[in-house]
Amino acid sequence: MFRFSFSWIGTKPRALQGTKYHLLTDAAGLPLHVLASAANVHDSKLFEPLLETNPSVRGRRRRPGRPRRRPEKLHADKGYDYPRCRRYLHRRGIKVRIARRGIEAKTHLGRHRWVVERTISWVLRFKRLGIRYDRTAATLLPLLLLAVTLINFRRLRQVEEL
């Protein structure tokens, strides 16, 4: 049995198979949280759920008190350039660094975007996630979380050895 999800382009239905991974990373590229969605779901739909699950992160300087729950600023690509996403960030007090749709900015976002692209390539190195053998989210999400855990473990082990 095959499962298809349809989206409409003009008057013809197009079956879009596959999965998109939405990653929240720190500045070094360590994945903090990851979500998976169908390929035909728009990126901005998972913007708030991805940021709501942001774990507490202690900064480089050991300040007394609680660890931070929100970043100072957030870099995102054009898929998140919607007023709803911008309002959400303003309400939480996060500086908005989202690329504008229709405007080509070669130097600004690319300096930060490659970190996320590299992290996505680390996730896709796991064969079961890159090819997507699993049909249900119940089997995909644990594998995705395991991949993110292994990536963090390997990166932190490299830092510890230095």
Each language-model region and where it sits:
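Polybasic low-complexity intrinsically disordered regions
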Residues: 1-101, 108, 162
